[in-house]
From Swiss-Prot:
Transcription repressor that specifically binds the 5'-GGAG[GA]A[GA]A-3' consensus sequence. Represses transcription by recruiting the chromatin multiprotein complex NuRD to target promoters. Negatively regulates expression of EGFR, a gene involved in cell proliferation, survival and migration. GO terms for molecular function: DNA-binding transcription factor activity; DNA-binding transcription repressor activity, RNA polymerase II-specific; RNA polymerase II cis-regulatory region sequence-specific DNA binding; sequence-specific DNA binding; zinc ion binding. It comes from Danio rerio (Zebrafish). Keywords: DNA-binding, Metal-binding, Nucleus, Repressor, Transcription, Transcription regulation, Zinc, Zinc-finger. This is Zinc finger CCCH-type with G patch domain-containing protein. SUPFAM superfamilies: CCCH zinc finger, Tudor/PWWP/MBT. GO terms for biological process: negative regulation of DNA-templated transcription; negative regulation of epidermal growth factor-activated receptor activity; negative regulation of transcription by RNA polymerase II. Gene3D superfamilies: 2.30.30.1190, 2.30.30.140. The gene is zgpat. A zinc finger (C3H1-type) spans 165-191. It is found in: Nucleus. PROSITE patterns: G_PATCH, ZF_C3H1. Residues 95-121 are annotated as: Disordered. The keyword DNA-binding applies.
Amino acid sequence: MDESSLEEAIGTYRAQLQQVELALSAGLGSAEQDDLLKLKEDLQQLIELTESSLVSVKKSQLLAALEEASTNQSDTSVPQETALDNEFAAFYAELSEDSNEVKPNPDTDEENEEEEQDISGTKVCAPYRTSWGTLEYHNAMVVCPEEPEGEEARVRVFYIHPTHKSMKPCGFYLEGKCRFMDNCRYSHGEVVCVSELRDFLEADISNMESGSACLAKHEDGIWYPARISEIEGGFYTVKFDSLLLKEAVLEADGIIPPLRQDDVSSSSSSDSEDDAECDGGYAKVFTSREEDLAQVNTAEFCGWEAHTRGIGSKLLMKMGYELGKGLGKTLSGRVEPVQAVVLPKGHSLDICAELTQRKTAAAIAKNNPTSHKRKAKKKKASTSTRHNVFDFLNSKLGDRAQSASHSSSSLVTGAEAYRGGKSTKRSLNVRLFEAAEKVTQVEREIQQLTKSLSKRNGRDAAVVSRLEEKLAASRKLLEQLKAQEQAIQREQKKADTHKKMTEF
């Protein structure tokens, strides 16, 4: 059967199926409905079979048409190919006749290709420019040569010991499946000039011992700064500098010496510090002389951002900052970064200030110990004499003042109030502040009560009487609080007069 007859048969079968469905919806007897249902199923199967045969007929027709088209193309392509061959032959003949130029030496081309093949896979020390502008050298491997930039030959390298995500080779790129290309977080190879390459540095861990600084390989394939805590049986237990990384047990190929020697020197100098109380809670603090003599190393500038995303230096660069120069419009501002001060946990600012004063005094004593001793002796003598004389007078006069003037709520003795010490002044200030807060709070309550009384005047006698009682009680409380505030102010004046009389 051809395509048209099959389509006509499908149309008639569908019309019969519609008639059967109409008969079923008419509500005939049960026996007739069973016959109609069987007829409906038969018609549906028949329609499916004819549709499948129609599809097979269409496929066979399409295949036949494609075969005819391919045979026609092959017949027409033969004269075209012969014409193209003739044109190429004429072109090559003209080139052979007109070429008087010197032919390149094939030996030199072969040598260049051999050199390019030889350099691929070699281990070198390649430069890496960080996002904050510093230049570092890392061990790397040459992957392939790149197009030269002018006369400079260039190669693509992958770093062997990546210290950042941007240095770690992208696994999908190596397989040719990376979809991000230039926007990938990982490295697709660094293109560097051949003149910038250095000799490969072998990792020598023979001198490393417990407590030595190193670079250790983490589970994510990145090498982080760490410190060796234990060496046993060829295995190294390392503790990473970052608190987010756990301890790890690695073999010898999992650690290398640090890239910069200042890490080692800083570790040795930190062990030799004596003042544990002050240095345990603070970062390094420079004295005035050290700040004058301090020189800025541009290679280490913004070095702290090796462990961050480097947003600070990026913002500076966007605002026009030039690396190594001063801040400001005229580049005359500060060059060195601000030293971070880490305060000890759980201590007040007074204790922190005492620690800083103690540290600066210790630094001054190291520079000039004789003058420090003289000042300490003078201070002891003056404090001892003043303490002995005035303490006796204050103890005698203060007891009387306490019994006469101080109320039961006062927590400061008369001698302390009259002496006017730091702790006394602080406690008086706190009490005065609390009293003032209470006074303002009670005044607000009185204002609210008066407003509510004015609104309910003549409406509800019980509510009005209740509000009047509250108003009277709050007014009495206000008088008491004001009296307490005045008493604290008198104590403050007493301490101030003592200070004026004792300072000559």
